[in-house]
């Protein structure tokens, strides 16, 4: 027999249950969108840059971080539905860092049924011996890893080496090179290695780091933190990462626009004489519909204050039409 209290509490319980059900449906919907977006972006990058071809053996470099786990997971999904046939072998370089949990990756890869190879090389001792305390280890560590991975690729018969750099890594590299190297240089989605023998691909070129974080949480990857360099909070790359995250939060769309700019480069509007023949440029006296203009049609829109926090408060926009009449 229902008591009066139970009868009164029933509507509240039903409301809570309905709210929980709605929240679960929304979460499932968002995860489905995330999955589709990740697979679409990786598939698009592979297509745009012809990263993987029929019969390729792709060596997926797996560090144990969210990015490489995500890359492997997405590539395995695409492998099942791709119109071409390619194989995957996951490779981890065990650098003998103290406390590195050697059992995690083999257990995960066996459970997924993925072919894998663990390469044991004590690069940790070399880096610690050569690099002074407090100095950045990334450069030497990267060179050592690269040489080892190239050798392993040969031994395994891999035709492609896949690295887990994402969209934010691309942007961060551009700013690092500008701020500290005086170069306008990013991170190519596909390249031939410096020894001329290997093709390196970055299938996550279009993927945002925040999406990889959400995917890693959803898939419950057994993340292995990098104790060698990941705790060096003063790294220039970490500072750049914080800058980009701040921009993304304060100015939605800015990061996407900057990333798209990499595929819309106009060499004639830069200053590299190796890319454009400024020295030999002379007027021909003949109008060219495809020719260059000093001012683009939408320059006025780019310069005009928009009223947003991103606009320059004291700048005044001058219509392009007026400038052309001067």
Curated annotation (Swiss-Prot):
One of its GO terms (molecular function) is tRNA binding. Its cofactor is Mg(2+); [4Fe-4S] cluster. Keywords: 4Fe-4S, ATP-binding, Cytoplasm, Iron, Iron-sulfur, Magnesium, Metal-binding, Nucleotide-binding, RNA-binding, Transferase, tRNA processing, tRNA-binding. It catalyses: cytidine(32) in tRNA + S-sulfanyl-L-cysteinyl-[cysteine desulfurase] + AH2 + ATP = 2-thiocytidine(32) in tRNA + L-cysteinyl-[cysteine desulfurase] + A + AMP + diphosphate + H(+). A motif (PP-loop motif) lies at residues 63-68. [4Fe-4S] cluster binds at residues 138, 141, 229. GO terms for cellular component: cytoplasm. The keyword tRNA-binding applies. The keyword Methyltransferase does not apply. InterPro entries: Rossmann-like_a/b/a_fold, TilS/TtcA_N, tRNA_Cyd_32_2_STrfase. Pathway: tRNA modification. GO terms for biological process: tRNA thio-modification. CDD domains: TtcA-like. Binds 1 [4Fe-4S] cluster per subunit. The cluster is chelated by three Cys residues, the fourth Fe has a free coordination site that may bind a sulfur atom transferred from the persulfide of IscS. Its EC number is 2.8.1.-. Pfam families: ATP_bind_3 (PF01171). It is found in: Cytoplasm. It is an enzyme of class 2 (transferase). NCBIfam families: PRK10696.1. Catalyzes the ATP-dependent 2-thiolation of cytidine in position 32 of tRNA, to form 2-thiocytidine (s(2)C32). The sulfur atoms are provided by the cysteine/cysteine desulfurase (IscS) system. The thiolation reaction likely consists of two steps: a first activation step by ATP to form an adenylated intermediate of the target base of tRNA, and a second nucleophilic substitution step of the sulfur (S) atom supplied by the hydrosulfide attached to the Fe-S cluster. Belongs to the TtcA family. Homodimer. This is tRNA-cytidine(32) 2-sulfurtransferase. It comes from Leptothrix cholodnii (strain ATCC 51168 / LMG 8142 / SP-6). The lineage of its organism: Bacteria, Pseudomonadati, Pseudomonadota, Betaproteobacteria, Burkholderiales. The gene is ttcA.
């Amino acid at each position: 027999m229902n008591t009066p209290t139970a009868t009164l509490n029933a509507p509240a319980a039903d409301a809570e249950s309905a709210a929980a059900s709605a929240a679960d449906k929304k979460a499932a919907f968002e995860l489905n969108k995330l999955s589709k977006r990740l697979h679409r972006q990786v598939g698009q990058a592979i297509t745009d840059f012809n990263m993987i071809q029929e019969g390729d053996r792709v060596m997926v470099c797996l560090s144990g971080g969210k990015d490489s786990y995500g890359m492997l997971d997405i590539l395995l999904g695409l492998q099942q539905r791709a119109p071409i046939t390619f194989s995957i072998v996951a490779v981890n370089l065990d650098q003998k860092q103290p406390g590195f949990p050697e059992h995690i990756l083999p257990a995960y890869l066996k459970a997924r049924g993925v072919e894998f190879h663990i390469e044991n090389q004590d690069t940790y001792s070399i880096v610690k011996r050569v690099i002074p305390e407090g100095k950045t280890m990334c450069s030497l560590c990267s060179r050592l890893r690269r040489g080892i991975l190239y050798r392993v690729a040969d031994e395994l018969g891999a035709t492609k080496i896949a690295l887990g750099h994402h969209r934010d890594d691309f942007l961060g590299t551009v700013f690092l090179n500008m701020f500290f190297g005086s170069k306008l240089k990013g991170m190519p989605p596909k390249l031939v290695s410096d020894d001329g023998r290997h093709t390196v691909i970055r299938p996550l070129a279009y993927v945002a780091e925040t999406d990889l974080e959400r995917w890693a949480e959803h898939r419950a990857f057994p993340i292995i933190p990098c104790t060698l360099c990941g705790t060096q909070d003063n790294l220039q790359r970490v500072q750049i990462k914080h800058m980009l995250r701040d921009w993304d939060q304060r100015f939605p769309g800015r990061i996407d626009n900057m990333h798209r700019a990499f595929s819309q480069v106009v060499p004639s509007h830069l200053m590299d004489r190796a890319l454009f023949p400024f020295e030999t440029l002379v007027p021909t006296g003949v109008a060219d519909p495809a020719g260059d203009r000093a001012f683009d049609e939408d320059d006025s829109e780019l310069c005009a204050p928009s009223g947003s926090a991103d606009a320059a408060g004291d700048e005044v926009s001058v219509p392009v039409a007026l400038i052309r009449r001067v």
